Design a protein with these regions (language model features):
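Compositionally biased, intrinsically disordered or flexible polar/acidic segments
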Residues: 231-408
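Secretory-pathway ectodomains
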Residues: 1-241
Length: 408
């Protein structure tokens, strides 16, 4: 039976301090969710000690100081809960820890909002700018700016993760330059309540007193998952200058962007999952058939399952502009996600006007359906435009993604 926090994890003592928990990294999956322990939306930040969350919910049914709305509700007594299960501890448990906690807030006036020192406004904080990063598409240094929608919490930089309320709870993994990940459904607090500690990303229930109609009034904890786990981000709508692209992935039919730890930023095309870099793509026909399936349907293959699971069908020609002229490695990602069997789909593909795949049957090459397949080629791109042509001889053309990496 586990006692205490996960080995190698970090504790969080509050006050918006850095908490560089290396166990908390993109992608993240849900470990548990529950609605037993709830907090008023403007309660102070919890602390995390030895795998236990120490929180002080506000007593939002108590009377406030009349004619002075800057003084908020008093605090209840500390509540202790296990971060790995969500279980609220009994008053008889962890007596040593309870005895060390200061009894604050019951008789002292509390401020209405709790924010990190860098946040200067209570409402509608500006879009965060958190240091600099290397743009994975261009290789250039730029300000680390990422999408934020509405919410009183402007975010906190915990060192490796930046977390914020962006409509729902959200986070950005700085170790990866992930883009913004929206934890859709639950509402996080007006105080920042999305905290990496104990090897988890902790998102306690900070919804009480809010009139917004969020669909999931719950708390949850998230744990790091393998790279095969499906999770999507929104990178932001950066403009793309001519001849600037050095590396890029195009994920046809995907519901969002995704950055890999080997360095490729995969963009959903068409862009549907939030703002993405403004790449210039031309297709013929202009509206081929895009399809998405969840990656859990995929078998183990050569491609990441979240790339292979989505496709474009019926594509005849594709042009991607604004590449930096030079020699490129071009990886074509495929998976037979329809019910076409062996011999029921065949296509010939030209890259920069030269045939690279002839009579290509995805099902036969992958030894089955729902299995990712990659074919890699090198080509010279002199005019800054990638050109791919597809001709189906049986059925319709099908491809999942394209990855381009400029050679040194």
């Amino acid at each position: 039976r586990r006692v205490g926090a996960l080995p190698g994890s970090a504790q969080y003592e509050g006050n918006y301090a850095r908490c560089e928990d290396t166990l908390v990294r993109f992608p993240l999956g849900v470990l548990w969710f529950d609605d037993t322990l709830s907090h008023f939306k403007r309660s102070p930040q919890p602390e995390f000690v030895d795998g236990i969350m120490v929180s002080r919910p506000k007593d939002w049914q108590a009377e406030r100081v009349k004619d002075n709305w800057s003084i908020d509700y008093p605090l209840r007594r500390p509540v202790l809960s296990d971060i790995y299960t969500g279980r609220v501890l009994l008053p008889t448990e962890q007596s040593s820890l309870r005895n060390r906690l200061p009894d604050i807030g019951r008789d002292e006036p509390q401020q209405s909002y709790y924010h990190a020192p860098h946040q200067k406004t209570m409402l509608n904080p500006p879009t965060p700018v958190v240091g600099t990063r290397i743009n994975p598409i261009t290789g250039l240094k730029e300000p680390r700016v990422f999408p934020k929608t509405y919410g009183c919490d402007g975010g906190v930089d915990y060192g490796l993760l930046y977390t914020l309320r962006s409509g729902t709870a959200a986070f950005y993994d700085k170790s990866l330059e992930s883009g913004t990940v929206f934890i859709s459904g639950p509402r996080s607090g007006c105080s920042n309540s999305i905290i990496p500690s104990g090897g988890l990303l902790n998102v306690p229930y900070f919804y009480e007193g809010c009139t917004c109609s969020y669909p999931l009034p719950i708390g949850l904890s998230m744990v790091a998952m393998p790279e095969t786990h499906e999770q999507w981000t929104s990178w932001g709508d950066d403009p793309v200058k001519p001849n600037s692209i050095l590396r890029i992935g195009i994920n046809f039919g995907a519901p969002g962007d995704r950055k890999t730890r080997d360095g490729t930023l995969w963009l959903d095309y068409p862009s549907v999952g939030g703002p993405s870099p403004q790449i210039r793509v031309e297709t013929s026909p202009t509206t081929p058939t895009f399809r998405y399936r969840h990656s859990l349907w995929m078998n183990k293959g050569q491609s990441q399952p979240w790339i292979g699971a989505s496709t474009v069908e019926g594509l005849q020609e594709l042009k991607l502009h604004d590449l930096n002229p030079g020699r490129y490695s071009v990886r074509l990602h495929f998976a037979e996600t329809d019910d076409a069997g062996k011999g029921e789909r065949s296509q010939t593909i030209h890259l920069q006007g030269k045939p690279v795949l002839s009579g290509f049957d995805i099902h036969s090459a992958a030894n089955g359906s729902m299995t990712g397949l990659v074919r890699e080629f090198e080509t010279e791109i002199d005019d800054g435009t990638l050109k791919l042509n597809f001709k189906a001889t049986v059925g319709r053309s099908l491809i999942s993604g394209i990855e381009l990496i400029r050679k040194p």
